[in-house]
């Protein structure tokens, strides 16, 4: 997360809500963050959180305009590049999205989220081996990211690395906070059982 941000705690809270919560909850936090940025008179943060509100509402073109404005105020804001890239993915602009992820990595190379999201995109377009490298880089920066282990497990599964995938899924379960993400937890436990059965049948 951008260390140059004037609202770092709010950005982290919003990121957690987007990753593990609901769209409604994330929108509520984004609007509260926007109000606080306005009260503090932080134009770059105002544009960033306006972009987040539009992104959550799935108004991707409008969100891009706000993220571009945020970047003009703070050219070192890796999160703004990252979220612009995510909007481009939603609009089907894949090659340029990859370039924006790279720009974010260039200006903020220690921001794990960008590596995670670039890995997510690479995995989705069939570049699984490359995706694994980006997920592992994200985890080297932020070892407790359950969502990254989840995506790493999927990429390894796509590469038929069943043992590696199983280990990654088990790591997800160990990192999820007790009582939260129940639906995600059930899904992952089912995947673990499926992989264990597959490995048992193959004698691995």
Regions found by a protein language model. Give the residues of each.
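Conserved alpha-helical positions within TPR/SEL1-like repeat arrays
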Residues: 15-19, 45-56, 79-90, 113-124, ...
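Canonical positions in the second alpha-helix
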Residues: 33-36, 69-70, 103-104, 137-138, ...
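Structural marker of alpha-solenoid helical repeat scaffolds
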Residues: 36-40, 73, 107, 141, ...
């Amino acid at each position: 997360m951008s260390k140059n941000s004037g609202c770092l705690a709010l950005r982290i809270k919003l990121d957690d809500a987007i990753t593990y919560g609901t769209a409604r909850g994330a929108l509520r936090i984004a609007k509260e963050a926007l109000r606080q940025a306005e009260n503090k008179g932080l134009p770059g943060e105002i544009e960033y959180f306006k972009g987040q509100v539009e992104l959550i509402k799935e108004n991707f073109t409008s969100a891009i305009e706000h993220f571009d404005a945020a970047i003009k105020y703070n050219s070192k804001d890796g999160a703004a590049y990252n979220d612009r890239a995510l909007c481009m993915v939603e609009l089907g602009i894949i090659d340029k999205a990859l370039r924006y992820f790279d720009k974010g990595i260039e200006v903020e190379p220690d921001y794990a989220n960008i590596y995670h999201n670039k890995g997510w995109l690479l995995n989705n377009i069939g570049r699984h081996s490359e995706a694994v490298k980006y997920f592992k880089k994200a985890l080297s920066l932020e070892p407790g990211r359950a969502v990254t282990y989840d995506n790493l497990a999927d990429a390894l599964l796509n590469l038929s690395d069943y043992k590696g995938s199983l280990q990654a899924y088990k790591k997800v379960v160990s990192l999820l906070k007790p009582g939260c993400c129940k639906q995600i937890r059930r899904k992952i436990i089912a995947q673990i059982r499926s992989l264990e059965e597959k490995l048992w049948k193959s004698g691995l």
